[in-house]
C-alpha cells in the first residue's frame, strides 16, 4: 500500500544530523573538554592526582557543558522563541535540542484511560473536542512572567498574566505542523538550583566540622549538600581535598549509614555517573531490575545516553550494550538496546503524511492481525521524534478509537509490555510517569527505597516541581506528605529537603 506524498523528497524525513561543532553533530565529543571553571581552587590544582582531576573534569564537562558556554539566546528569525538553553542532567545542547523532554504535558484533553492512571492535560487547557478560544479570551497562563508566545500568522497574544497555556495545534489533514513548546522548558523546573554566594571552601569547612570529633552533625550535612546544585557539589569535592588532603566521599561513607548514606552519596555523583552505577546495580547478581533499566533509558536525552555509554565503559570495562545483552533477552532486550543508542530523531516538525503511515503500520502490527509484530512497535517508538510520536498517538486514537497504551496492554505482556508503556508515558507526560513510579515505590507494605532515591535525586534539578504537581493531581495527596509518612529519621529529612516543599 502506498500513501500520497510518501516517501518524502530528498531532504525530508528524517532530518539530517546537525552540523559539527563544539555542541553536537560530527564535532561531538569535542577533542578537548571545556574547562570546569573552578577558579576559586585553581591555585591548588597542582596538589591533586592529575588522573583524578581529569576524570572529574571529563564527567562534569560532559554533563554540564563546561564553563565556556556560548550565548544561550541568539536572535531567532521571525520573532519566535530562541532555542531552549541546556537544562543540566544530560540535556542536549542548543544545536541538538530535542522536542520538549522533561516537564512535557500531553495535548489538551489528555487520553482516555487504559487501566493505568490517567494523565490530565495542563491546567487551563480546553475541554476535549472543543476549539481553543481566540486570543484575548484565553484563561490566564499558569506560569506568571512567561514571555508572550507567537507563531507565524498568529494574532498578537495577550501580555503576561492574561496569556493562554501553549497547546498542540489540531492535527488534521497532511502537511507539516510545528507543535507548541511546553512552558516547563522555559526555565528550571527543579527544586534545587545553584546556591547564590556559593563558596566551596567554606562548605568544605562546614562538612569537615560536621564529621570531626565525637558524633556527626547530620543536619549540617543535609543543609549544606541538600541545597547545592550537582555542579557545586563537584566543586566542594575538590575543595575538601585541597584544604584537608582527604577524600570527602570516604569521610561521608565512614560517618553515615543506611538509606541516608545512599541518598547523600547519590547526590555527590554526577548525573551520568549516577545512572551508570544504577544500571550496574540493576543487572548485578541474581535477578534484574527491569523497571530501573527502562526508567533510565526511556527518560534521558540523546546526549545524556551517549555520555552514559562512554562513562559505563570507562567505569566497568564493558559496554552498556554488552551489559544489557548479558542480562536480558528477546524483544525486551531489543527495546533496551534500541533506546541505549541515544539516537532518537530530534526534529521538532511533524509530517502528517508520515504520521498517518506510522499509525497504519502500528495498527497493522497489532490490533489488525493475529499475533503482534513487536519489531514494528520497537522501530517506530524508539526512533521517531517526540513531536512526531505525540501526533501519532493522537491520530491513532482518532483513527482506531483506542488509546495506544490500551493497544499495547492488549497485544503484549511482561517486561516488554511494561517497557513499551514506559516509553509511551515518557513521551506523553514525563512528570506524570515519574509521579506514578514514586507512588508505586511508596505504596503498600515496604518501600522501594532505591527507586525513591533515584527519582528524587535524578529529577531534582530538572522537573521535580512538575512531578510534585502531577503527584498531587493523580493521587490527591502531596509528594511531601507521602514521603513524610513512608520514611523516617535523617533519610526522611534529606528527601524532604530535595522535595523542596509541600503542595
From Swiss-Prot:
GO molecular function: calcium ion binding; calcium-dependent phospholipid binding; phosphatidylserine binding; S100 protein binding
Localisation: Cytoplasm; Melanosome; Nucleus envelope; Nucleus, Nucleoplasm
Residue spans of the Annexin repeats: 198-269, 270-341, 353-425, 429-500
Main location per the UniProt record: cytoplasm
Annotated region described as Disordered, given as residue ranges: 80-197
Family (UniProt): Belongs to the annexin family.
Subunit (UniProt): Interacts with PDCD6 in a calcium-dependent manner. Interacts with KIF23 during cytokinesis. Isoform 1 but not isoform 2 interacts with S100A6.
Protein name, per record: Annexin A11
Organism of provenance: Bos taurus
Gene: ANXA11
Amino acid at each position: 500500500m502506498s500513501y500520497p506524498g510518501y516517501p518524502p523528497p530528498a531532504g525530508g524525513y528524517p532530518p539530517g544530523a546537525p552540523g559539527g561543532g563544539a555542541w553536537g553533530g560530527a564535532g561531538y565529543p569535542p577533542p578537548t573538554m571545556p574547562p570546569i571553571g573552578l577558579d576559586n581552587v585553581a591555585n591548588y590544582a597542582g596538589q591533586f592526582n592529575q588522573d583524578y582531576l581529569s576524570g572529574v573534569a571529563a564527567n562534569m564537562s560532559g554533563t554540564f557543558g563546561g564553563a565556556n558556554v556560548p550565548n544561550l539566546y541568539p536572535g531567532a528569525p521571525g520573532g519566535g522563541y530562541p532555542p531552549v538553553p541546556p537544562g543540566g542532567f544530560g540535556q542536549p545542547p542548543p544545536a541538538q535540542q530535542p522536542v520538549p523532554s522533561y516537564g512535557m504535558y500531553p495535548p489538551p484533553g489528555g487520553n482516555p484511560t487504559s487501566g493505568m492512571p490517567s494523565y490530565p492535560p495542563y491546567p487551563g487547557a480546553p475541554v476535549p473536542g472543543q476549539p481553543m478560544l481566540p486570543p484575548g479570551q484565553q484563561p490566564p497562563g499558569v506560569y506568571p512572567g512567561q514571555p508572550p508566545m507567537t507563531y507565524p500568522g498568529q494574532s498578537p497574544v495577550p501580555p503576561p498574566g492574561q496569556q493562554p497555556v501553549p497547546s498542540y495545534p489540531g492535527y488534521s489533514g497532511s502537511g507539516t505542523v510545528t507543535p507548541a513548546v511546553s512552558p516547563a522548558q522555559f526555565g528550571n523546573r527543579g527544586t534545587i538550583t545553584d546556591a547564590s554566594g556559593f563558596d566551596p571552601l567554606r562548605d568544605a569547612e562546614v562538612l569537615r566540622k560536621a564529621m570531626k570529633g565525637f558524633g556527626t552533625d547530620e543536619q549540617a550535612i543535609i543543609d549544606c549538600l541538600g541545597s547545592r546544585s550537582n555542579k557545586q557539589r563537584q566543586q566542594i569535592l575538590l575543595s575538601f581535598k585541597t584544604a584537608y588532603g582527604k577524600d570527602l566521599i570516604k569521610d561521608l561513607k565512614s560517618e553515615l549509614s543506611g538509606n541516608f548514606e545512599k541518598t547523600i552519596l547519590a547526590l555527590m555523583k554526577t548525573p551520568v555517573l549516577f545512572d551508570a552505577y544504577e544500571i550496574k546495580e540493576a543487572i548485578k547478581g541474581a535477578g534484574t531490575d527491569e523497571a530501573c533499566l527502562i526508567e533510565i533509558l526511556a527518560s534521558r536525552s540523546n546526549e545524556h545516553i551517549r555520555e552514559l555509554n562512554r562513562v559505563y565503559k570507562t567505569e566497568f570495562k564493558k559496554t552498556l550494550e554488552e551489559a544489557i545483552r548479558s542480562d536480558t533477552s528477546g524483544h525486551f532486550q531489543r527495546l533496551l538496546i534500541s533506546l541505549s543508542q541515544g539516537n532518537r530523531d530530534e526534529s521538532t516538525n511533524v509530517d502528517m503524511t508520515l504520521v498517518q503511515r506510522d499509525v497504519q503500520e502500528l495498527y497493522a502490527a497489532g490490533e489488525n492481525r493475529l499475533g503482534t509484530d513487536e519489531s514494528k512497535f520497537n522501530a517506530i517508538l524508539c526512533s521517531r521524534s517526540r513531536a512526531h510520536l505525540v501526533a501519532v498517538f493522537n491520530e491513532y486514537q482518532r483513527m482506531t478509537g483506542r488509546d495506544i497504551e490500551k493497544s499495547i496492554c492488549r497485544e503484549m505482556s511482561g517486561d516488554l509490555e511494561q517497557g513499551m508503556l514506559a516509553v509511551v508515558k515518557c513521551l506523553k507526560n514525563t512528570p506524570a510517569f515519574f509521579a506514578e513510579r514514586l507512588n508505586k515505590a511508596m505504596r503498600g507494605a515496604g518501600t522501594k527505597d532505591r527507586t525513591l532515591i533515584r527519582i528524587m535525586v535524578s529529577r531534582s534539578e530538572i522537573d521535580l516541581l512538575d512531578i510534585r504537581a502531577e503527584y498531587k493531581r493523580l493521587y490527591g495527596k502531596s509528594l511531601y506528605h507521602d514521603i513524610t509518612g513512608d520514611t523516617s529519621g535523617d533519610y526522611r529529612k534529606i528527601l524532604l529537603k530535595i522535595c523542596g516543599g509541600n503542595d
